[in-house]
Amino acid sequence: MEGQTPGSRGLPEKPHPATAAATLSSMGAVFILMKSALGAGLLNFPWAFSKAGGVVPAFLVELVSLVFLISGLVILGYAAAVSGQATYQGVVRGLCGPAIGKLCEACFLLNLLMISVAFLRVIGDQLEKLCDSLLSGTPPAPQPWYADQRFTLPLLSVLVILPLSAPREIAFQKYTSILGTLAACYLALVITVQYYLWPQGLVRESHPSLSPASWTSVFSVFPTICFGFQCHEAAVSIYCSMRKRSLSHWALVSVLSLLACCLIYSLTGVYGFLTFGTEVSADVLMSYPGNDMVIIVARVLFAVSIVTVYPIVLFLGRSVMQDFWRRSCLGGWGPSALADPSGLWVRMPLTILWVTVTLAMALFMPDLSEIVSIIGGISSFFIFIFPGLCLICAMGVEPIGPRVKCCLEVWGVVSVLVGTFIFGQSTAAAVWEMF
């Protein structure tokens, strides 16, 4: 029956998820996971530390979140092996049934679309600030047409982002992910060093707040952490592209990736907050003098970092549309080239459509800080709720001892409840701030 889960059929052993080519090395998987997590959220972490009321409460929230973040990645790898599916939405649909699968697809597509828009908006802002810095020596005058992000962002999208987004497999992104990870490391290093060197023109708060105003303010940073560390959407695709897919090996890859990300995020958050205190901007680079050459280089490299992570997000969003194409009647009409959704004649139009839609939205979108809470709230579905549901549903697939089974089911329930709380709290707070 359509409503049956794999657990009702019973599987003697874990099938390997179907994938075109398992060519990704362990180090490549680490870099892609890191790059998926090291996105625009890096700029928001000093602001999140300020909102939480200081270093200690924010760091504690980060450590608690890290437990669930790593757990979610491990669960997704296990669920992919059990279900035999090669995409996040396919795993959820295979284990939890078609109804939850459709909900996952809708949330997945919406979340990735908004993340892509946010990334393009960050790139556009950095390009605009970079142009302002380079033209700062000229008298005040209207901004030249070639410095307007309405020109620079579409040009960058056509010449750089679109070619990087064209490849069929996610394994290709391991090359650009190394460059993007190094760019994120440079940003963290700059913020740390700037705190100690204290360059001329830098003004910081003399006595930053070191205690939270309320528990509500502490909980309010969860969406920023979810937005920052979200790499779970890519987890299944990365796992299925790896040459070595044992669960213990995947757990090691997940732990190493998130610990490295935690170090980079923590350095950025701590020293950005200690430098500016409660006056820190939601985009920490905006708090630094615009004519500082070190900051100008950081802007360029961070824009490069976001450019390299955008294709990963596009790949995941495109996979949802390809699944829809495969299940619908669209693939059965016309030439045989259109029957394969991963083929060039289907893949490239979907890629161009995604870039065009997100670019149009980015050029008219409000300030990034206004939607981070919403994105972070939706991300809780993919970090907490769906992995928890997959773990609960997967318990009937393999023979497991009753005590271990009970413990894993309890952990799945806890994960779902925590994700539901974060989604409700962050969404309510975002709506409240809008009005």
Curated annotation (Swiss-Prot):
Its main location: membrane. InterPro entries: AA_transpt_TM. It is found in: Membrane; Cytoplasm, Cell cortex; Cell projection, Axon. The keyword Transmembrane applies. Keywords: Amino-acid transport, Cell projection, Cytoplasm, Disease variant, Membrane, Transmembrane, Transmembrane helix, Transport. One of its GO terms (biological process) is viral genome replication. The chain crosses the membrane at residues 29-49, 55-75, 100-120, 151-171, 178-198, 218-240, 250-270, 295-315, 348-368, 374-394, 410-430. GO terms for cellular component: axon; cell cortex; membrane. It catalyses: L-glutamine(out) = L-glutamine(in); L-alanine(in) = L-alanine(out); L-histidine(out) = L-histidine(in); L-aspartate(out) = L-aspartate(in). Expressed in fetal and adult brain, and spinal cord. In the brain, it is localized in the cell body and axon of the majority of neuronal cells and in a subset of glial cells. Found throughout the neuronal retina, with higher expression levels in the inner and outer plexiform layers and the photoreceptor layer. Very weak expression is also present in the kidneys, thymus, and testes. It is a multi-pass membrane protein. It comes from the Eukaryota. GO terms for molecular function: L-amino acid transmembrane transporter activity. Electrogenic sodium-dependent amino acid transporter with a preference for L-glutamine, L-alanine, L-histidine, L-aspartate and L-arginine. May facilitate glutamine uptake in both excitatory and inhibitory neurons. The transport mechanism and stoichiometry remain to be elucidated. It is linked to Foveal hypoplasia 2: An isolated form of foveal hypoplasia, a developmental defect of the eye defined as the lack of foveal depression with continuity of all neurosensory retinal layers in the presumed foveal area. Clinical features include absence of foveal pit on optical coherence tomography, absence of foveal hyperpigmentation, absence of foveal avascularity, absence of foveal and macular reflexes, decreased visual acuity, and nystagmus. Optic nerve misrouting and anterior segment dysgenesis are observed in some FVH2 patients. Belongs to the amino acid/polyamine transporter 2 family. This is Solute carrier family 38 member 8. It comes from Homo sapiens.
